[in-house]
């Protein structure tokens, strides 16, 4: 499913996970301004439930197929409490293959705009 989602979003959108609406919107607007867009992904209790373990308080990987990025975000969320946070999953946009092989530099334009906006 992660592979399908990466293909579905292509090399245009990066996935964003956040527990804070204002932070998520700030990142989305910074990305739009930089022409480096993000697509917000769900943080759902079902992904957290998939991290249950018989051997540890919390597993760091789900035993279910797919949704690896979603369960990874659920894992991160377990450690931040009420702190606003966001994770940009850049796996689908960080590199190009073929004749344009190499790093894209993304999400640097988004992050520069985001930090400028925060400084104002």
Q: How does the language model describe each region?
A:
Residues 1, 6-120:
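A generic structural signal for tightly packed, nonpolar segments enriched in small/aliphatic residues
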